[in-house]
Amino acid sequence: MGYSVIVIDDDEDTVRLFSEFLEENKIHVIGQGYNGKMAVELYQKNRPDCVLIDIMMPNGSGFYAINKIKEINPHAKIIAVTGDGRFTTEQKLEKLQIPVIYKPFKMNEVIQKIQS
């Protein structure tokens, strides 16, 4: 069986395109959300193998969601997908041990991170 993921980004086009690409590559998208609060709700409901999440979003940032998801499951696999390359963001992600993919990204890089 393939991997299951939820895709979280405040840009609906990004979520749609990302999801289509993942499905084409046999990665099952079991949830889509547009803010940190939705990410937590989708994780609780679906328990995916992996969460792909943007960092800068309204109604609960990616960091909010990461912390809440880690409270639910400390071993949850989360990958940050962000255009925010500030050093402070990098430090926070490193401290949380969250791998990051910077926008613009290559989809092959995303597939590799999900499967690793």
Q: Which role does the model predict for each range below?
A:
Residues 46-52:
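Active-site beta3 strand of CheY-like receiver
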Residues 105-114:
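C-terminal output helix
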Residues 35-38, 59-64:
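Acidic catalytic/metal-coordinating carboxylates
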Residues 43, 55-57:
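Residue immediately C-terminal to the conserved phosphorylatable aspartate in receiver
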Residues 12-31:
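Two-component/phosphorelay signaling modules centered on CheY-like receiver
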Residues 41, 63-74:
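Short amphipathic alpha-helix used as the core "switch/output" element in two-component signaling
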Residues 9, 54:
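Active-site residues of response regulator receiver
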